[in-house]
Amino acid sequence: MSTTAVGLEEAVLDAAARLYVWALKDIPQDLRDALAAASERETSVTGIRVLETIRRNVEIADEQQNLVCQDTGIAVYYCRVGERFPLHPAGIYRALKAGTERATVEHPLRSNTVHTLTRENTGANVGYRVPIVHWDFVPGWDGLDVKCVPKGSGSENMSFLKMLVPADGVNGIKRFVLASIVEAGGKPCPPGIVGVGIGGSADYALHLAKEAIARPVGTRNPDPLVAQLEDELYGLLNETGIGPMGLGGEVTVLNCHVEHADTHMTLNPVAVNYQCWAARRASAHLGADGSTTFERDA
């Protein structure tokens, strides 16, 4: 391995360690604004108290430089890798895994990762195929963008997939998303962000739903038809009355984001992925020389 590659791998490792902790401690400003707006919009006495408690929790985390939630989740990374970035993806993955482990040990953070059958804890939030990394490759570019989205179990357990048929149409999509959120109730710690993935294949629809929750709160899909669906779903979901923490109220979700892909003419896969109120995310941009810039959304 070249000296440049060694230095880059260490830079990625350091970025991953910092991103994981940053995401867990400091929620994004757009999320803070969404929670504040929710507090103003909520009319239920219980709902208002829940939202006030959530916002006070965030203030205490800021004051004490501590975690906003005890569930440190599974570390999920989204990587945009330039074609000319000098470090091979295998080295990037190795660094992301080592960075996650370093953050867990040095902070220390609660370790959640276990073997799926024995349930034995791996000890440092890493394990077989963990952390989870999603890749996107950019032709002609020499940089690397890394986004860390820690995902807790309460919200991840409320994930849904349905293979609709084309005849179900847009109304079928709406019915399924609405039914999913009603079934979830208060389990995913609402109000949060609902991610919807439409199209592709079964696995890709789930991927798109997860990608949707990683966007800044309230951003809209560039496709006007999809953006319209986001607005309609957002309104419908807040008519359920589930409310903050499932205790009733006006605000069930902070927003709904939809990502889509073209699909087979006889398919209509739809997936739902819920993100809890904490909606943690943090990003970094690395240059070919290892220089690193930390941003909320790289």
Which residues make up each language-model segment?
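Non-transmembrane, aqueous-exposed alpha-helical and coiled segments at domain scale
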Residues: 1-298
